[in-house]
Each structure stands twice: as structure tokens, then as C-alpha cells.
């Protein structure tokens, strides 16, 4: 594949073939699992190279046809010529169409019902048409009924689901529908600027189009007004419907590495047929590539016509990836009611569903999604591995994760991170332990992990010099009555003592108080384990003996006390080691297993203790800081960091602190739990500002803020914004959002906000009723018809009171400010708008049916006085 690739597309009726185009056009076949041929291979997808088409270079647009006998494409060129290619050596001149006037071909669309009919769109020419309907079996079109749009340009084109109506975006200002069933095709048009990317959903209920950063949804059966507009932060590059889902719309945005998905839902509330959507952004790149710079942007996407939620992606105009959407559970909240969106299902049953009947040792985890008819469908990934739903935790189906996240937000989860506060929240023990660990490690406005504290792999940096200190080692003496020839070497340094404290262990002189605290918290086995690690074996026996009196089943503690009190390592170490592996399976308490592993160790081999995952990472790290040499300690820290990244264990932040490894741990936890709330709040509370340049942190925070907005939790959102702003540099950036005049485009905000001196009523009214630059009238309030910026009570002779040295905008109550709907753009004074929507549901403008207040989750009848 030479040069950059501009686009790619699956063939609708050839599920294993796709075409890519750029300088040349190439045909590929996805390699089967048992195919080991080496004809050609792309870097990130196993394919066989089949053919290329060199006659048509630098294609402007390419469309794969619906022919079922052979792969055929239509190619549109910059000079307007359109060619039909079947990747054979034979040349047929009848398969080329050249318009009368030379200009660029802009769009192509095959008819799904009649595979020989092609719709062609060209750029504008004043004496020629821009839309051509070509039946390739009948040769070059000549009848006037096949040409439309004289003196116009075609921006995009598609077919309706009845396959007899052509829908075209024309001249950047309208959408036209041409019904070809009529002898002289009738035309229906609607004025709009969203004319790019026209496409009809698989169920035929929605028509989508876009311009810049706005996506518009239409009803193709009644296209008088849009159903909904979706605003994005970036301009769109491509939009497309997923063919295996009823209403899943995908969008690629310029200079973005994410795929944005909109799950469109219609809820018939009071016969209004309101449209809602659930937005989701996913990164198609493997986690190990997300921060490596290997991939930057997604340039093109092509959905597979049969495989469930499978797509081809073009990254950086060079790399082609075969991608399938990860399994997710959707539960959304509308502003009026809760909308449950369960496990997504395909539109139809695959032709050959896979079945698994392997032995227990060979069986791979599979799952199925039940359809309404009771049958089951198994979905497989392109590589052959099963579409695994069983990997989702069962709690996800039993608990409403959205409700849980929303409830935590209402309880100020993560706003004030302190241990007492987290004890009052409804958190899992895992999250409560994670936050407690982070609070313990966080000091001096930094989350310094044990890796930095111990000076591991820091080179010759200043942190390494601060962490370097003299390490003392001493041989510990076993207690009297316990004969053990193994030398137990303990390592001490200032950094290791600090690490022990960060792990929650007390200093030697405060050990008894620490053990008593654990005993008071009924952590008996952990207290006994720490005593044994400090060679206070008889103290551990006393703890377990006292604890056994308070237990319903004291047998395990009693047996442990007997074993410890009569332990003699030199006499029975071999016997204990032989029995330990089988006995550990019977001991359910991990702390007791660690006790026996420690006592029966061979020389300085502590692997059994360090690999006991039932013991918390902080306890294992404290043990490692006490008994491991420098080299072994560094290796163990590196192993645990990698294990935390692979498993998504937030406890690994104890080791990494605020670093790139810490961000990788958060990303891995996010991938496995979908808990964007915890990930965002950890980053906000404990990561320094320099790390906020990482796109992943920005994405987590933006996603969580979007959740708060969708729930109408404006005050919680504001509190979080204030907290985020407090950790940023104190230098305040200049204002970047202005009110601009519709006529001259200049800022009106300065005139509206900066009024340091009181003015007379007449002067102020005249000045505020028009643009200060072009003097054109400003918008009026929909209810009182006063101009924007005019105080509500000015017409009654009241003047706003101002105080010296106070800007004018601070003396205006919020209820007198101007607000407007983001959908219909109608507005007015906030006080008037609030009063109107307490009694009405539609926009106050008589010709507008927009339900403006439904965009907010707050009920009008419960609003408090905002003046």
C-alpha cells in the first residue's frame, strides 16, 4: 500500500472483503484463522492482498456496491468522471460516465434494492445539473428524467429506505427529496445548513446530517422540522449509522482519537415523540498504545454490514484496524424519567452462529444474548475469540450503577476526601480502603508513592538524592523457645521507616499501641500476623487466644495458637513445608496463611508471603521494606506496579503516586469497572496540575462533568469546577466567551457588563437596545419585548442602584439577566422565562413548539427565587 490512505469501506455482500483508496485503490480479503498464506499483510490486521486498480488515481469518493456476484465499486474523480471497477483486467468503456461540464465529483450512493442504479453528485455549474441517476446496465444516462439540480451543487447524497427517493444536500443551504416514482420527479425541500453526511438509519426512522460541530436528526417521513440537534465541541469529520443496530450513530471528529457514539431513543411522552440520546466516547486503540504516540487520530470508519458492532478504522491515514465495540450496559436518565438501555442486540440473527462444545479444560468463556423469541445468539470477535459477556461482573446486572454513581454525587463523594467522610458514604470496602490509603500517602500537596520515597529507579535526580540514605542491616534474634537456624536480616533506613509509616505500620516504639488498635477494630488475624513479622510470636498467641473466646467458630484460632506455641523450625521445618501447601487450602484466612509461610521459609525466600494476594498490598509492601534487600525490593516494586496496571488495582497508586504509571492504573481500572466517577475524582484530588495535560485525565473529568450536567446537578458541577480551578495556576486567563452581534459579529458583552457609572434612564435604555458597533437592534425578550440588556423595571422609572468602585454588572440581580434556549435560540429576561414555564411547557414564541425547559432536569414548580 503506497502513500496515504484516504478512505476504506466494507463490501455489503462480501463480509470478508474491503477496499481502500488513496493514490491507488486496493482490494483486500480478511484472512481466515486457518489461512497461513503470506500474500500481503497490513501491520495491524491480517489480510490477503487481492488486487488493485491503477486507472483511477487520487479518487475523491468511492462507494462499494450491493452486487452479490462480484465486488464492484464506483469511483468519483476530481475532473467529474465516474468509473465502475470490478478489479478485472478487462476494460469496458460503457462503465464510465463523464458530465457535460467538467467539475469535481462530490458524492456517490448505490441503490440497495436495485444494485445497478447509482446516484452521482457533482459540484456546481451554472449550465449543468448536479445530480445524475445512472443505471449501469443501460449505459451512459441520456434521458432528462435522470438529471436534477440545474445550477446547484450536491454536498451529500443517499437513498431512502424505500429505495425510490433520493435525498440530497444541495448548495450548502437545503436538503431536497426527489421521488423517482413520478414521471417528472417531484421535489420536496427544507432550508438548512446541515447538508453534509446525509444518511438514513437502518430502521428508516431517522435521517441524519451535519455541518461543522452540529448534527441534526430528521424524520424522513416528515422533514418539515428537525427532531433534534446535537452539539459537539469539535467539528465532525464523518457520521455513519451502525447497520447492525437500529439507531446507533457514530461520529468521527477532527483531530480526535476517539469514536463518539450516539444511541438514539424515542420516548412517546404525552404523544410528543421526544428524542433522547445517550452519548459515549471510546478509544479504539489498545491501552498500551494510547499514550505511546503510535496512533493519534481516527480518519475514517466503515461499519461491517453483518458482524455485530464491528468496524474498520483508518488511523493517521496509514494504519487500518479491525475493531469491535466493547460490551457495555447502558442505563440513562432523561430529565423526566429513567430510561433503561440494556444489553444491545443485533438487528438480525447471524447466518452461522457459533456454538461451543469444548471440554472443561478447553472451553473458552462464552455468553449469549437472549432474543425475544427465546433463541440465543453467540457473537465472536474478528480474531475468533468469543464475545464475552460473562466477564462482566454479575453485580452489574443486579445493581443500577447509574443510580449508585448519582447517589454518590449527591453525597459530595470526592469533594472533601477525608476518612471520616468516606465512612459515612455508601462505598464498597475496596473503594473505602483505596481512599484511606491515598489520604495516608498524600502529604505536602503531593501524592508521593513508595517508588519515589524509596528512591527506586530515579537515577541521579534530586528526588533520588533526597531518597538516598544509609541502609543499616542487622540479624534478628528469634524468641526464646523457638529454634530456627535461618538468619533473619532486617533492613533499616530513614526512607524505609517512612515507607512503613505510609503503609500504615507504626514505628517499633509504637508497635504495641498499633497492635492494640487493630485488636480493638477486631482485626485479630492481621494483628497476629504483624506480631509474627516482628518476631513477637507469643504476643500473637495471646491475641489469637483472646480472639477465640469472642468467635462463634474458634477452632482455627485455637489450632493456630497450638501450632505457634509448639513451633520449632529446626526440628520440624521440613514436615511443616511438606504440609503447608495442602494445609493452606484449608486455611481461609490469608493472614494466617502468611504467618505459616513466614515461619517455614527457606533462608531468605519470602515469595510465599509476598505473593499472598489476600493480604493487602500495603501490608505486603511494609513486609518487603523490612526484609528485602535493595535489589529484591526494587524488583518487587516493579512487579507490583505492573500487576496493578494489568489488573486495574487502584491500590497500586500506593507505589506509583502521581505519575504516568498512576495514570495507567486509573485507565486500567476505568476499562474494567466503567467507574469514571472515581477515576476523575482521584485525579482531581491527588494529581498535580502538570499531569492534567494527559488527554486521558481530561477525558475522565469531562465525562464526569457531562454526567452531572445530564442529571441536572448544577450545584455539584459548580463545586467540582471550583475545586478544579483551585488546583490550577493562580494566573487568570482572559475572558474567551462573548455575546456577539448577529449583524457585525462584534462583541456586545463589554457594553452590557461594564457600566461603572450610573446613567440616566433614557441614555442607558438607548445604549443597551442596540449594538454599540453597528447600532442594529439587539434581540428582544419574548415576553416583555424589551431589548436584551434593558433592565426589567426601567420602563417604570426605576433605575438600578450602583455603588462606587463596583462594576455595573454586579449590581444587576441574576433574575434580570438575559437567557435563551440552546435549541430554538428564543429567550428573554430570566425572571420572565421562569414565570412563564411555571405554567407552560412550550416556548413563549407563538410559532415555536420547542419544549425549552425540558432541557433542564429541574422542575419549574420547585424552583426557588433566584433574585
UniProtKB/Swiss-Prot annotation:
Principal place of residence: nucleus
Binding site for Zn(2+) 2: 784, 829, 832
Region (Disordered): 350-378
Residues at which Zn(2+) 1 binds: 741, 744, 771, 774
Record's keyword terms, sorted: Cell cycle, Cell division, Developmental protein, Differentiation, Lysosome, Meiosis, Metal-binding, Mitosis, Nucleus, Oogenesis, Repeat, WD repeat, Zinc, Zinc-finger
Binding site for Zn(2+) 3: 821, 824, 852
WD repeat residue numbers: 51-86, 100-144, 149-188, 190-228, 231-272
Phenotype seen when the gene is deleted: Egg chambers contain 16 polyploid nurse cells because the oocyte enters the endocycle and develops as a polyploid nurse cell.
Keyword Magnesium (UniProt): no
GO molecular function, one term: zinc ion binding
Biased composition (Low complexity): 350-376
Tissue: Present in the oocyte.
TM stretches of this protein: none
Record-linked Gene3D superfamilies: YVTN repeat-like/Quinoprotein amine dehydrogenase
UniProt similarity note: Belongs to the WD repeat mio family.
Domain notes for this protein: The WD repeats are important for recruitment of the methionine nutrient sensor unmet.
Complexes and interactors: Component of the GATOR complex consisting of mio, Nup44A/Seh1, Im11, Nplr3, Nplr2, Wdr24, Wdr59 and Sec13. Within the GATOR complex, probable component of the GATOR2 subcomplex which is likely composed of mio, Nup44A/Seh1, Wdr24, Wdr59 and Sec13. Interacts with Wdr24. Interacts with nucleoporin Nup44A/Seh1. The GATOR2 complex associates with unmet in the absence of S-adenosyl-L-methionine; the mio-Wdr24-Nup44A subcomplex is essential and sufficient for this interaction while Wdr59 and Sec13 are dispensable.
Function summary: An essential component of the GATOR subcomplex GATOR2 which functions as an activator of the amino acid-sensing branch of the mTORC1 signaling pathway. The two GATOR subcomplexes, GATOR1 and GATOR2, regulate the mTORC1 pathway in order to mediate metabolic homeostasis, female gametogenesis and the response to amino acid limitation and complete starvation. GATOR2 activates the mTORC1 signaling pathway through the inhibition of the GATOR1 subcomplex, controlling the switch to cell proliferation and growth under nutrient replete conditions and during female oocyte development.
Name of this protein: GATOR2 complex protein Mio
Biological classification of the source: Eukaryota, Metazoa, Ecdysozoa, Arthropoda, Hexapoda
Amino acid at each position: 500500500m503506497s502513500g496515504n490512505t484516504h478512505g476504506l469501506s466494507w463490501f455489503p455482500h462480501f463480509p470478508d472483503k474491503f477496499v481502500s483508496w488513496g493514490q491507488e485503490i486496493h482490494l483486500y480479503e480478511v484472512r481466515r484463522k486457518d489461512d497461513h498464506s503470506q500474500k500481503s499483510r497490513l501491520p495491524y490486521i491480517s489480510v490477503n492482498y487481492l488486487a488493485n486498480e491503477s486507472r483511477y488515481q487520487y479518487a475523491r469518493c468511492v462507494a462499494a456496491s450491493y452486487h452479490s456476484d462480484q465486488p464492484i465499486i464506483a469511483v468519483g474523480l476530481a475532473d467529474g468522471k465516474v468509473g465502475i471497477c470490478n478489479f478485472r483486467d478487462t476494460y469496458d468503456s460503457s462503465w464510465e460516465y463523464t458530465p457535460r461540464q467538467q467539475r469535481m465529483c462530490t458524492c456517490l450512493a448505490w441503490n440497495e434494492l436495485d444494485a445497478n442504479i447509482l446516484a452521482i453528485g457533482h459540484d456546481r455549474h451554472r449550465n449543468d445539473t448536479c445530480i445524475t441517476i445512472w443505471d449501469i446496465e443501460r449505459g451512459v444516462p441520456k434521458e432528462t428524467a435522470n438529471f436534477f439540480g440545474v445550477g446547484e451543487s450536491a454536498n451529500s447524497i443517499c437513498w431512502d429506505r424505500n429505495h425510490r427517493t433520493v435525498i440530497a444536500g444541495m448548495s450548502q443551504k437545503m436538503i431536497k427529496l426527489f421521488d423517482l416514482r413520478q414521471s417528472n420527479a417531484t421535489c420536496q425541500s427544507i432550508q438548512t445548513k446541515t447538508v453534509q453526511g446525509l444518511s438514513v438509519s437502518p430502521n428508516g426512522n431517522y435521517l441524519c446530517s451535519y455541518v461543522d460541530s452540529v448534527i441534526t436528526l430528521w424524520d424522513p417521513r416528515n422533514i418539515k422540522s428537525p427532531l433534534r440537534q446535537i452539539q459537539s465541541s469539535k467539528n465532525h469529520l464523518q457520521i455513519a449509522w451502525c447497520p447492525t443496530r437500529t439507531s446507533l450513530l457514530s461520529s468521527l471528529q477532527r483531530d480526535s482519537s476517539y469514536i463518539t457514539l450516539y444511541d438514539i431513543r424515542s420516548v412517546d411522552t404525552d404523544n410528543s415523540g421526544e428524542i433522547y440520546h445517550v452519548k459515549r466516547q471510546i478509544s479504539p486503540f489498545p491501552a498500551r498504545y494510547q499514550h505511546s504516540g503510535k496512533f493519534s487520530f481516527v480518519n475514517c470508519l466503515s461499519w461491517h454490514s453483518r458482524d455485530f458492532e464491528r468496524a474498520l478504522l483508518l488511523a493517521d491515514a496509514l494504519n487500518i484496524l479491525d475493531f469491535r465495540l466493547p460490551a457495555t450496559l447502558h442505563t440513562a436518565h432523561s430529565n423526566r424519567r429513567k430510561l433503561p438501555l440494556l444489553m444491545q442486540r443485533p438487528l438480525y440473527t447471524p447466518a452461522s452462529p457459533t456454538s461451543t462444545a469444548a471440554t472443561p479444560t478447553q472451553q473458552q468463556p462464552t455468553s449469549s444474548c437472549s432474543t425475544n423469541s427465546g433463541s440465543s445468539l453467540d457473537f465472536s470477535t474478528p480474531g475468533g475469540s468469543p464475545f464475552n459477556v460473562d466477564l462482566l461482573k454479575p453485580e452489574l446486572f443486579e445493581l443500577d450503577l447509574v443510580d449508585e454513581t448519582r447517589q454518590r454525587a449527591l453525597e459530595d463523594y470526592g469533594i472533601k476526601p477525608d476518612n471520616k467522610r468516606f465512612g459515612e458514604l455508601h462505598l464498597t470496602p475496596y473503594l473505602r480502603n483505596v481512599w484511606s490509603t491515598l489520604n495516608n500517602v498524600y502529604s505536602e500537596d503531593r501524592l508521593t508513592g513508595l517508588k519515589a520515597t524509596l528512591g527506586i529507579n530515579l537515577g541521579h535526580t534530586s528526588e533520588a538524592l533526597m531518597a538516598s540514605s544509609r541502609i543499616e542491616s542487622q540479624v534478628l534474634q528469634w524468641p526464646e523457645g523457638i529454634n530456627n537456624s535461618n538468619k533473619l536480616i532486617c533492613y533499616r533506613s530513614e526512607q524505609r521507616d517512612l515507607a512503613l509509616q505510609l503503609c500504615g505500620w507504626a514505628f517499633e516504639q509504637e508497635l504495641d499501641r498499633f497492635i492494640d488498635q487493630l485488636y480493638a477494630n477486631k482485626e485479630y488475624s492481621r494483628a497476629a500476623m504483624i506480631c509474627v513479622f516482628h518476631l513477637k510470636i507469643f504476643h500473637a498467641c495471646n491475641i489469637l487466644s483472646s480472639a477465640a473466646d469472642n468467635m462463634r467458630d474458634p477452632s482455627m484460632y485455637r489450632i493456630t495458637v497450638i501450632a505457634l506455641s509448639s513451633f520449632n523450625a529446626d526440628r520440624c521445618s521440613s514436615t511443616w513445608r511438606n504440609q503447608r501447601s495442602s494445609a493452606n487450602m484449608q486455611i481461609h484466612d490469608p493472614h494466617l496463611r502468611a504467618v505459616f509461610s513466614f515461619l517455614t521459609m527457606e533462608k531468605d525466600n519470602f515469595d510465599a508471603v509476598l505473593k499472598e494476594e489476600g493480604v493487602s498490598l500495603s501490608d505486603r509492601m511494609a513486609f518487603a521494606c523490612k526484609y528485602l534487600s535493595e535489589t529484591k525490593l526494587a524488583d518487587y516494586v516493579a512487579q507490583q506496579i505492573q500487576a496493578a496496571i494489568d489488573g486495574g488495582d487502584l491500590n497500586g497508586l500506593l507505589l506509583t503516586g502521581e505519575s504516568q504509571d498512576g495514570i495507567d492504573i486509573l485507565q486500567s481500572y476505568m476499562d474494567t469497572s466503567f467507574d469514571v466517577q472515581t477515576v476523575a475524582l482521584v485525579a482531581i484530588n491527588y494529581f498535580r496540575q502538570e499531569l492534567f495535560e494527559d488527554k486521558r485525565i481530561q477525558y475522565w473529568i469531562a465525562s464526569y462533568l457531562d454526567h452531572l450536567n445530564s442529571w441536572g446537578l448544577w450545584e455539584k458541577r459548580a463545586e467540582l469546577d471550583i475545586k478544579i480551578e483551585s488546583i490550577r495556576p493562580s494566573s487568570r486567563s482572559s475572558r474567551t466567551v462573548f455575546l456577539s452581534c448577529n449583524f457585525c459579529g462584534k462583541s456586545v458583552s463589554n457594553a452590557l457588563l461594564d457600566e461603572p457609572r450610573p446613567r440616566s434612564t433614557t441614555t442607558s435604555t438607548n445604549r443597551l437596545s442596540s449594538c454599540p458597533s453597528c447600532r442594529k437592534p439587539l434581540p428582544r425578550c419574548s415576553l416583555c419585548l424589551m431589548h436584551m440588556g434593558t433592565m426589567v423595571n426601567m420602563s417604570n422609572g426605576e433605575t438600578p442602584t450602583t455603588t462606587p468602585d463596583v462594576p455595573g454588572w454586579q449590581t444587576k440581580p441574576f433574575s434580570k439577566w438575559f437567557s435563551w434556549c440552546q435549541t430554538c435560540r428564543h429567550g428573554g429576561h430570566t425572571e420572565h422565562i421562569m414565570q412563564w414555564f411555571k405554567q407552560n411547557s412550550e416556548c413563549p414564541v407563538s410559532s415555536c413548539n420547542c419544549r425549552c425547559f425540558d432541557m433542564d432536569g429541574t422542575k419549574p414548580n420547585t424552583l426557588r427565587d433566584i433574585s
